From Swiss-Prot:
It comes from Mus musculus (Mouse). The lineage of its organism: Eukaryota, Metazoa, Chordata, Craniata, Vertebrata. Residues 31-65 form a coiled coil. Interacts with MYCN and MYC, as well as with other transcription factors with a Zip, HLH or a HLH-Zip motif. Interacts with all STAT proteins except STAT2. Interacts with IRF7, the interaction is direct and leads to the inhibition of IRF7-mediated type I IFN production. Interacts (via coiled-coil domain) with TRIM21 (via the SPRY domain); the interaction leads to 'Lys-63'-linked ubiquitination of NMI. Interacts with IFI35; the interaction is direct and is facilitated by TRIM21. Interacts with TLR4; the interaction is direct and leads to NF-kappa-B activation. Signal peptide: none annotated. It holds the Pfam family IFP_35_N. Disruption phenotype: Knockout mice show decreased inflammatory response when exposed to infection of injury, which can lead to lower inflammation-induced mortality. Display normal development of the immune system. Belongs to the NMI family. Residues 1-24 are annotated as: Disordered. This is N-myc-interactor.
Amino acid sequence: MDADKDNIKQACDERSAEMDDMRGEQSMGLVHEIMSENKELDEEIKKLEAELQSDAREFQIKENVPEKKLKLTSVESPKDGCHFSNSSCSFQVSSQILYELQEGQALITFEKEEVAQNVISMGNHVVQMEGTPVKVSAHPVPLNTGVRFQVHVDISKMKINVTGIPDELSEEQTRDKLELSFCKSRNGGGEVESVDYDRKSRSAVITFVETGVVDKILKKKTYPLYMNQKCHSVAVSPCIERCLEKYQVFSAVSKKTVLLTGLEGIPVDEETGEDLLNIHFQRKNNGGGEVEVVKCSLDQSFAAYFKEEARETI
């Protein structure tokens, strides 16, 4: 009888030990699983932080902006709020003007316009080239026509472009699915005002009711679109409108640059010729002044490009 009791007690002790071992193994397994999940979450957090930094860099503009003094005279209160629905900018674009410098010619640019005009008015000049007097003639630089225009850019704060839309449903059903997907706040969406869907290009322009929704959506380049019990990834981008205005064609004569002719066959190379012309036209007693740059063309022709700092003739 006592032996039976001892056997039962021993069996209970062994069972208890087995249970303790099982609990320990389960605990270790649970700890390992939690650690593995934490590691995956840490990697996901790092990935999301990298994406946020990348998106932030895309919206940054690195440019040294000169200081400006501003005087605020009044505060406008637009009634319809349209002034705050777009980010706008405008700038003027002017084409560079090409001039082909032929052999035996040189271009010389002075710091001051009046010096260049004086050199031209004198007509002929005698320049010493390694002991050889060379007669050169000064002329205005005849430039070809150029163009200028203004570019206006409006970036909407209320609209986005959506591309890569699956062509699985009718146009009306697709518009409904777009509206339903982009109104989900958990994905960064908001109340949709309208959906302009183009089936041919598989794209759409979506207009939202509230400001701020577009900024949240554009933090990522894609957005989930739910259609036919599937989740598709569509591309989202800013809605940008561009407009060209005040297109003008003009011809001009450079104000600070002078064309010199008569340099064919001079007994020096181009670099030496440029130095000698620079020295000659630096001197005031030769009708010159401070020189910015000289370019000679003795052996081959060159292409020179002028920016719009010239006087318009038409």
